Amino acid sequence: ANGQLADDMGIVMGTSHHEPMMRPHKDYTKRRKEVGPWNYATNKEGIDSFFIEGAERSRKYESIVTIGMRGDGDVAMGGGTDEENMAVLSDVIKGQREILGRVHGKDPAEIPQLWAVFTEVQRYYDKGFKVPDDVMLLFCDNNWGYIRRVGPWQEQRRKGGMGLYYHVDMNGGPWNDRWINTTTIPKLREQFNLAYQSGIDDLWVVNVGDLKPKELPIDFIMRYAWNPDAIQADETDDYLRQWAQQNFGEAHAEAISGLVARYSKYNLWRKPEVQSTNIFSVVNHCEVDRVTDLWRTLAHEADSVGQLMPQAYKDAYYQLVLYPVKASAGVAEIYLAAAKNRLYARQGRVTANDYARRVEELYTVDTVMTAYYNKVLAGGKWEKMMSDIHLGYTKWSMPKRDSVPQVVRVEPLSKPTMGVAVEGCETLSPEGELELPVFDNFENRKYYIDIFNRGTGTFDFKVKTDEPWMDVSLRKGKVETESRIWVGIDWTKLKAG
């Protein structure tokens, strides 16, 4: 039924890189006992029969047939050496082409076929494995959106041509990338242009996962594939504005295109499924604070624009802009806040508890936003579309449930107790000697000193400097939780040398 419907609508059908001869892997797993082991060296007859069924079932439809063979599922073939596997693969392809010729009643060279040069298969190609010239070579990215090679010059005249298999969604190693869009338009344009300019332009296959979270990259790739020369490297912002205008009208197109560009960029820094508390530094270059501010600013702007949306656009805005922005911001800040919580707890800061509460608050917000998307938005039209687990990954495979990083609670001391910490150092005074990073007059940066409370109540502090060229942002104050003082150098007061 699917094949007939696709053919009626002019859709060319095919199967994945590990599903040869128009047979989905599920076709095999349902009949594993009947077909026998997925091993061509020991079960040629059973597997050939399986392949014949696929060829016969699809012969009346317009298709492109994946040839070759990998392991049982999306895994490498067998346990032999590359040379042994290449010898088996050669027999597999010879047998597959004989089957295609018999079933279709014509020269196999007249039947569209591809060989996916994917993961371990690229090693075989690089070692000299060849397929007939009429077979398309489907080169692949690295599972994370970077093509592994441009079109080899010696392949650019091959009869079968060259194609690309590209991921904007990944379920597998090295890490999942499923929940939300993490791909920027400039990156997509760069990668597909590399393919296009080097002759990888006969077929582009894109792994889009569950479709809904990846609507933006899907739209761009389809437009770019239609006419690659129409979108130049310096025109990706124009594309985003046109996309925003098409979906939300002219009034807010500029603002929305900026929101979408930035959340995609920030997610590309660190995809949600690969977040941890160790990515950005709490003490160096104010990384955690800077990234937190970027995400919070973005989320605030998305809220502000959302309030201006006409009612007719509200649902679409939530799906395409507000949820991706705020949910991504929430996941990022959960790990950023947890990183601060852990360091501050080791230092005994009472503010460690504030960051523990922040982690819990953000998790609640994430749960509420996701429930709204799944249950309320558009009358529940997209139920379970945003049910992917996206918090608590420790390896590539999806956890059983969302979970936040473990946080630590601090029991304040019974009386106000001062602690001091400086930028670039995780230790604190009076437990260790503190030293600010080196100042220079090129960047002319300022560095901070944190004065914080480890107990209950308040205390007063004063700051003294030994040199007149030292600038401090605060000379005295009262601390209940913490206070940050910025230290800089007035280079005009320093003598040369």
Segments (PLM) and residue ranges:
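Structured mid-domain segments that build the active-site/substrate or prosthetic-cofactor binding neighborhood
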Residues: A1, F139-G145, P152-Y313
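Short, solvent-exposed loop/turn segments enriched in Ser/Thr/Gly
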Residues: N441-I449, T481-S483, T492-G497
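C-terminal non-catalytic alpha-helical accessory regions
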Residues: D238-W396
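Surface-exposed binding patches on compact interaction domains or structured appendages
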Residues: R454-W486
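Active-site-adjacent "subsite" loops/lids of carbohydrate-active enzymes
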Residues: T15-I52, K159-H167, I185
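The substrate-binding groove and active-site-proximal loops of carbohydrate-active enzymes
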Residues: A1, K30-D48, R70-S90, G172-P186, ...
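Gly/Pro-rich turn-and-neighbor structural signature
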Residues: N2-D8, Y40-K159, T292-A316, S328-V331
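Beta-sheet-dominated interaction scaffolds and their linkers
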Residues: Y393-R454
